[in-house]
Amino acid sequence: IVATALVVYVMNFRDDVSNVTIEEMELSYNTNIYAQDSSGEWVNIYEVTNESQRIPISIDDIPQHTRDAFVCAEDERFYTHDGVDYKRTVSAFVNMFVHIYDTNQGGSTITQQLIKNITGDSEQSPSRKIREIFRAMELERAYSKDKILETYMNYIGFGGTSNGIEHAAQKYFGKSAKDLDVAEAA
């Protein structure tokens, strides 16, 4: 009876999930104004900045070792799950009560973190987590792993007002993300 009630409770959230798309993300970008100097070289003469600074970059321009470093750190089973890492989710849930780990272990996958950023839903509740799980599975059906990873890497914060891998690479290493070496990517 308890199991049936739990299944009915969880399945009610399936109908509550609206389609979430990557295109819904509101990303703020800086605007750069360029002019040619006396030698004909284009130079940045003015930059209009937003609260968060971000420079978009295609997944094709992000080296494989940089992608691998993100996946290894954030979601080691990213390429094999359907948006939800059930092992991590159950482990994080059990840790809330039993404290197996010294710190709170996140159970969210890259896709789930992206959902949280798209929706802005940060409520700490089982119902939000269930909605997030269904939305993550939906997003995984609608987009490729590369598109999800690209959007995630262009969105996440790297400290201060720096958001996205390209802005962070330029800020911290003085180079494009496409030029990061293995040590810098880690």
Regions found by a protein language model. Give the residues of each.
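Juxtamembrane regions of bacterial inner-membrane/periplasmic proteins
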Residues: 1-186
